[in-house]
């Protein structure tokens, strides 16, 4: 039966009021989210996005990289490249180098965050795959504070070259800590490769373990 608009509106308001009364009589607690104000919900979702990104790692001075030859990386193999990088850096600056990077060793990757003049991490970051690091050490005659690693860099034409990267740490202890952290990353990467089936024979396992070698002195 047709009803005027005012009567339909009154009927709707009466039904809504009765439903609200039923809800208030229920003993089950209403979910707490219903009592949150819109402003509070908005703050909860946006506040974490506004926080500055923090990085855990060791502040270092990145000395650069230099190509190296050979496939067998034994103790002392980074001495010559490190001396070359050290000389280039000492010619350009004083004996005291300000930290310009943050080295972060993760289970399967090494992140080198570049710092700005305020000492804060920038968006520029170099990434190294642990599986392509052939050797690392914190034992150098030119300075006990230097940590270096040999990395297999793959070019655009799929050829590769071995580069020696070096950083100067704040102390000898920090350099040793980086070497030990890298060794732990080696172990996790090796076990992951083995469990994924990328290492099949025992001989291949021995070769992989020799390639992922660390010498912390």
UniProtKB/Swiss-Prot annotation:
Q: What are the record keywords, sorted?
A: Cytoplasm, Phosphoprotein
Where is this gene product found?
A: Cytoplasm
Query: Acidic residues bias located where?
Result: 208-217
One term under GO cellular component: cytoplasm
Decide whether keyword Phosphoprotein is in the record. yes
Its job = Increases proliferation of preadipocytes without affecting adipocytic differentiation.
Q: What is this protein called?
A: PTB-containing, cubilin and LRP1-interacting protein
UniProt source species: Mus musculus (Mouse)
């Amino acid at each position: 039966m047709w009803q005027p608009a005012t009567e339909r509106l009154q009927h709707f308001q009466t039904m809504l009021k009765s439903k609200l009364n039923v809800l208030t009589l229920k003993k089950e607690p209403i979910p707490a989210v219903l009592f949150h104000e819109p402003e509070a919900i908005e703050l909860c979702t946006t506040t974490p996005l506004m926080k500055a990104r923090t990085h855990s790692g060791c502040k270092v001075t990145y000395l650069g990289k230099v190509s190296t030859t050979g496939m067998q990386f034994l103790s002392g193999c980074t001495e010559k490249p490190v001396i070359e990088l050290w000389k280039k850096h000492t010619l350009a600056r004083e004996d005291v180098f300000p930290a310009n990077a943050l080295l972060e060793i993760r289970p399967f990757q090494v992140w080198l965050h570049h710092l700005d003049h305020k000492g804060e991490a920038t968006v520029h970051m170099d990434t190294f795959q642990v599986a392509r690091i052939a050797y690392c050490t914190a034992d150098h005659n030119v300075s006990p504070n230097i940590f270096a690693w040999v990395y297999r860099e793959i070019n655009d034409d799929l050829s590769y070259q071995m580069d020696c990267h070096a950083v100067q740490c704040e102390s000898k202890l920090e350099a040793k800590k980086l070497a030990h952290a890298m060794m732990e990353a080696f172990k996790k990467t090796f076990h992951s490769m083995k469990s994924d089936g990328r290492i099949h024979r025992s001989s291949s396992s021995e070769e992989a373990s020799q390639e992922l070698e660390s010498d912390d002195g």
